[in-house]
Amino acid sequence: MRVLLASLLIFGACWAGPVVNTNYGKVEGFEYGAAEVFLAIPFAKPPVDNLRFEKPEAPEPWEDVYQATQFRNDCTPHYRLVAQFSSYSGEDCLTLNVIKPKTIEKKLPVLFWVHGGGYEIGSGSQHGYEFFADRYTSQGVIVVTIQYRLGFMGFFSEGTSDAPGNYGLFDQAAALRFVKENIGNFGGDPDDITIWGYSAGAASVSQLTMSPYTHDLYSKAIIMSASSFVGWATGPNVIDTSKQLAEILGCPWPGAKECMKKKTLHEIFDAVETQGWTTGTIDILRWSPVIDGDYLPKNPENLINDAPIKPTLIGMSNKEGSYFATMNMGRVIADFGLSPEEIPKVDEDFISEIIDRKLLYNNRYGENRQKVWDQILDYYTKQGKPERDLNGFYVDRYAELLSDITFNVPILREITARVERKTPVWTYRFDHYNEQIWKKYIPEQAKGSPHANEYHYLFNMPVMAQIDFKKEPESWLQRDLIDMVVSFAKTGVPHIQDVEWRPVSDPDDVNFLNFQSSGVSVKHGLFQEPLDFWNNLREREGFDLVDPAYSKTTSNSEKDEL
């Protein structure tokens, strides 16, 4: 019997996974190839019951070894249908994942990944751990992926000190602080953490670089396809949306928070379906951060002046808006998609109607509304107008209109602001696309690299198509994008092949690395024309459609919102 017991103990010990100490207790992970993986480590108390709609609190210490061997709850999205697609979804979700090399001879740089999804959907589990282990940690970095509260759970706000909102941002800060304090035990360098995000994750990273809560918690930043300067990253309608949701649920306003804490997820999801899950306007998101005087003490265009000077990598695709417009994707967070039947009908009148209904709603620009309408319509439908293939031209210009307002211009504004403060900023644009991602009915003129296209290459995720990375140019493009990220995390300077890629030197003529099917090269003048158009319009009119929260003057109705 003793021999059997001893054998079982030896067998169990042989199969035990790697164990690491944290400030809150031990965690046990598992091995995957040449990596060690630790999943769903709690970095905060579960934000449930009395902690719903509150800032995150440090986790309770645990005595037993925590089994960090499987993904657990994804954070609750803003819409029931999305939750139903998740294998795990719930409020107890504030966890992070660590993927590290088995063998570590010195402290390694850390990549801290913040997922996107419009602050309303997404998870730390959606990227898995296998590809990170195979292509990132194998190059001598540690990868951390996190989760944060989303939608109404993460961003419900009354605009008061008692219910300010931004709980999802405070979750990100709590996760980053946990990593800062504990990553050394995993073999990581707490003084060499690169924060990295895409889309709303990129806007979050931009906000992390500026918030007084996180100034000292990172060393470098990678901001892909978004910015804290975009209007939807500090939504002008969040408080109104919160009030409407509370009223549907029968909660008093102001002072709805305690009542909202008692509502079940089922009740809140029912109310969201009554309310609608998208705005239907250029402001896009119902739920997003707000300028709360705390995490974001002021608008990012002002807050960036207080941000520390640290190396930053910023990039985008050349047709960001086509993901939402011509591809008709992201429908659970944005309502701008064109159906196959609508695409052949897109013309100047269609774009004019979009400007009227979705951009200039609520009497934006006041008495100058018609003049601004005409200027926007002229810029996007008259300039460069061809004699033939007008439908392809208009479909492309519709997508460009969305691209410029929601991605290109605000990203360029952030690049400009950082460069003017002497921050070393490297910039890229990804133009390549695989034909498989585009439907046959899309006009050729409207094709390009859409938002989320890099997900195929950075994470091997078939967001739009299953791409064969054994073929060229897909293979070298994937290698170069990953090398760009890893080299920047390791050295603070991105390296691509033998290309001499320098930081941006002239904010009025931005130099950038251009990824094309034929190769990579350095170019100048990144989206300069639309940047000039929207900057001049803001200066003339005193209102900024790109970022309403920054506007100097507004119509009376807009003032009420802000």
Swiss-Prot record:
Its EC number is 3.1.1.1. It is an enzyme of class 3 (hydrolase). A motif (Prevents secretion from ER) lies at residues 559-562. Expressed only in the intestine. Its main location: endoplasmic reticulum. Residues 1-16 form the signal peptide. This is Gut esterase 1.
